[in-house]
Amino acid sequence: MIGQALGQLAERENHEVVAYSRRTAKSGTGKQTWISTAEHPLPETKLDALVHLAGENLLGLWTQAKRERIWKSRVELTQKIVAQLKTWAPENRPRVLLSASGVGYYGDRGDSVLDESSSRGTGFLADLCEQWEAAASEAASLGIRIVHLRTGVVLSRGGGAFPLMRRAFACGVGGRFGSGKQWMSWIHEQDQVGLILWAIQNESVTGPLNLCAPGVVTNADFTRQLAAKLRRPAFMHVPALALRLLMPGMGQEMLLASQRAVPNSALRSGYSFAHPTLESALAALI
């Protein structure tokens, strides 16, 4: 979803895009498409920037097998990519590697305001993001600038969580999760891809980058605004205990955890958000 949107934006701005995909038809963009395999995820070609967004979908029951797929598709794949970059001719290596991560890095932090300098939290996602970022950082030894894309909930018509949420609310069964007091860091797809392209072009951007809008809201406020925009009720609510029992791990870390992440690095560096508030984002989506 994000890779395709990013490629389309880059092409509109006259950049040449090389898409790496396990399936040619899925790339959806790029004058060239290279087929990635488990052992050779990154066939060599000359690049200025490499954006690595691959990873097993986090949604679903976090069985042991699911957790292993999540880990391998992020940490181990990133390790393989960096290992391959080390074999490339120096003139072909990208000047910058932008590697996906997430605000799950911060763990469940209540009302604490979290910027890029905030410490790592605890939990499966925090451990995952730490090791994921560490794997990408190994490319710095090659003289490559590293940017860790700590992404919040991406709001997009094209996929991810938003179409599921919209469908639930449209059917009148939308509502808050648990108390609803947990902070929910989100970003509109337009700003997600805009920030990535902006980070490619701005050499001062390095290290962690929170990809989330300035207007962070609680889950209860998100619920209220989405219901109002759809003109639907939002009386339902899913008790925290039910989420923990029905979705072990995922329920606590993705739906109940509170991450009040703010995009300090982007704002300090001069990025202008197209949708800084949830009201603006929902107006564009609905």
What are these regions (language model features)?
Residues 101, 134-157:
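Conserved beta-loop-beta element that borders a ligand/cofactor-binding pocket
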Residues 166-174, 182-217:
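Alpha-helical substrate-binding/gating segment
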Residues 26-80:
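NAD(P)H-binding glycine-rich loop region in Rossmannoid oxidoreductase-like domains
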Residues 130, 142-144, 155-164, 199-209:
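Glycine/proline-rich active-site loop of Rossmann-fold NAD(P)-dependent oxidoreductases
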Residues 252-286:
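C-terminal amphipathic/interface module of NAD(P)-dependent oxidoreductases
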Residues 121-124, 152-159, 179-189, 200:
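Glycine-rich "substrate-gating" loop/helix at the edge of Rossmann-like oxidoreductase active sites
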Residues 202-249, 283:
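Mid/C-terminal beta-alpha module of Rossmann-like enzyme folds, strongest
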Residues 79-123:
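Conserved Rossmann-fold NAD(P)-dependent oxidoreductase catalytic core, especially the SDR/UDP-sugar
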